[in-house]
């Protein structure tokens, strides 16, 4: 892709996520059946947090594209570094994680993650927008341009910190309301929940490492010299 095409692509995807972040909170806002969905805000759902994260990332990517064209430089240190850090440590791992875990649980027993009653409010296209297209967009981004990964120690630490923050949010929500964010937790005993969280982090960390490998496989010759310049 040319720089102009890449910029247009980032702009279109950015606006797609802006639309989703605006539209989804309005669904069934005054409907008593969706009261639990709206109570506590979007921060209790990893899927909705990810949509916000995607909007931020593609906004930064679009800004990076525009500034490079205006200034005429290949690299704008702070913006480009922020873009790459967001993508490598959060956007790629979390989007892939949501896709894998959601659809695995959905086809095993959808009541554990996405009860059938939600179909009345969230049409199929919106379900796929939240849980399927997110993977498509990050894979396109991986192929579209190289991303400079931090050290494994830093990358996994940042990912782990975000995992811990979200787990804390889930547990705090349960302690305040007695309701689990996702039905799957209600089917597990305390040990099962601990194991579930551990497995989720291991999966997230594995996805991070796979993303790094894919990036190196596709862009290794391009990325290496730039990474050496940072030293």
From Swiss-Prot:
Main location group: membrane
Xref: InterPro entries: ADTRP_AIG1
Tissue: Highly expressed in flank organs and weakly in testis and earlobes.
Record key words, sorted: Cell membrane, Hydrolase, Lipid metabolism, Membrane, Transmembrane, Transmembrane helix
One Pfam family it belongs to: Far-17a_AIG1
Cytoplasmic side stretches: 1-7, 67-85, 145-154, 212-231
Biological process according to GO: lipid metabolic process
Subcellular location: Cell membrane
Induction pattern: Up-regulated by androgen.
Membrane-spanning segments: 8-28, 46-66, 86-106, 124-144, 155-172, 191-211
Membrane topology field: Multi-pass membrane protein
Reactions catalysed according to its record: 9-hexadecanoyloxy-octadecanoate + H2O = 9-hydroxy-octadecanoate + hexadecanoate + H(+); 12-hexadecanoyloxy-octadecanoate + H2O = 12-hydroxyoctadecanoate + hexadecanoate + H(+); 9-(9Z-hexadecenoyloxy)-octadecanoate + H2O = (9Z)-hexadecenoate + 9-hydroxy-octadecanoate + H(+); 12-(9Z-hexadecenoyloxy)-octadecanoate + H2O = 12-hydroxyoctadecanoate + (9Z)-hexadecenoate + H(+)
UniProt site (Important for catalytic activity): 47, 131
Molecular function in Gene Ontology: hydrolase activity
Extracellular-side segments: 29-45, 107-123, 173-190
Enzyme class: hydrolase
GO cellular component: a single term: plasma membrane
EC number: 3.1.-.-
Recorded family membership: Belongs to the AIG1 family.
Its job: Hydrolyzes bioactive fatty-acid esters of hydroxy-fatty acids (FAHFAs), but not other major classes of lipids. Shows a preference for FAHFAs with branching distal from the carboxylate head group of the lipids. Regulates the expression and the cell-associated anticoagulant activity of the inhibitor TFPI in endothelial cells (in vitro).
Miscellaneous note of the record: Expression was reduced after castration and reappeared after testosterone treatments.
Protein name stated in the entry: Androgen-dependent TFPI-regulating protein
Species per Swiss-Prot/TrEMBL record: Mesocricetus auratus
């Amino acid at each position: 892709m040319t720089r102009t095409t890449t910029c247009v692509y980032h702009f279109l995807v950015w606006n797609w996520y802006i639309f989703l972040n605006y539209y989804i909170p309005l669904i069934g806002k005054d409907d008593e059946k969706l009261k639990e969905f709206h109570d506590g805000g979007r921060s209790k759902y990893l899927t909705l947090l990810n949509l916000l994260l995607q909007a931020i990332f593609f906004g930064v990517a679009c800004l990076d594209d525009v500034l490079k064209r205006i200034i005429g430089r290949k690299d704008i240190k702070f913006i480009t570094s922020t873009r790459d850090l967001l993508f490598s440590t959060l956007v790629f791992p979390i989007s892939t994680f949501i896709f894998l875990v959601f659809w695995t649980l959905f086809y095993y027993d959808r009541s554990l993650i996405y009860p059938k009653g939600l179909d009345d409010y969230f049409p199929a296209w919106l379900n796929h927008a939240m849980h399927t297209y997110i993977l498509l967009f990050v894979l396109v981004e991986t192929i579209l341009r190289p991303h400079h990964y931090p050290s494994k120690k830093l990358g996994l630490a940042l990912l782990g910190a975000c995992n811990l923050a979200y787990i804390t949010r889930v547990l705090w929500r349960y302690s305040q309301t007695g309701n689990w964010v996702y039905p799957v937790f209600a089917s597990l005993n305390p040990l099962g929940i601990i194991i579930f969280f551990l497995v989720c982090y291991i999966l997230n960390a594995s996805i991070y490492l796979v993303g790094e490998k894919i990036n190196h496989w596709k862009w290794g010759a391009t990325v290496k010299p730039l990474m050496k310049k940072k030293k």
